[in-house]
Regions:
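N-terminal helix-turn-helix DNA-binding core of bacterial DNA-binding proteins
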Residues: 3-42
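Basic, amphipathic "hinge/linker" alpha-helix immediately C-terminal to the N-terminal HTH DNA-binding motif
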Residues: 66-85
Length: 150
């Protein structure tokens, strides 16, 4: 899957999809506009605008005052984007340096699928072992890996 081939999804909107996906994985509930704004360090009005676009494109269901949840296609796409970011972070960490989540997302978004797969092989690390949910939330790691409920 190459995100640049996905109609209607820019690098910026992909950040929102990943944020909604990770918030759901961490909490198991719909993400609020405020949660997304905090996660991305943006204004709630910016979140509302972007969620409207992603809702219209069919990637998520945004119900004002009830939160946001990804559609099946949004979940699949966000899971793939999240994996890309994780692979880039794992590879760079393996080199003994760090680039941060924002930069890893940008690089992961732009790289061709074959390059991401190659980095995953070169990092010699199961990306999902790096789940940010913490050891007490192993079920969330399974969700991120795609083996939990979607």
């Amino acid at each position: 899957m190459d995100p640049t081939d996905e109609p209607g999804v820019t690098e910026a909107s992909a950040r929102y999809l990943v944020a909604v996906f990770r918030l759901w994985a961490e909490s198991g509930r719909r993400a609020s506009t405020g949660d997304i704004a905090d996660r991305l360090d943006v204004e709630p009005s910016s979140v509302t605008d972007m969620l409207g676009k992603l809702d219209a494109a069919g990637y998520l269901d945004h119900a004002p005052h009830r939160g946001v949840e990804l559609t099946p296609s949004g979940t699949e796409f966000a899971r793939a984007l999240s994996r890309r970011q994780c692979v880039v972070e794992a590879f760079v960490d393996g080199l003994g340096t760090s680039i941060g989540a924002e930069r890893a997302h940008a690089i992961g978004y732009r790289l061709p699928a074959a390059a991401v797969d190659r980095l995953g092989v070169e990092s010699d690390l199961d990306c999902w072992d790096r789940c940010r949910a913490g050891e007490d939330r192993l079920d969330d790691c399974a969700k991120l890996a795609g083996v939990g409920p979607a």
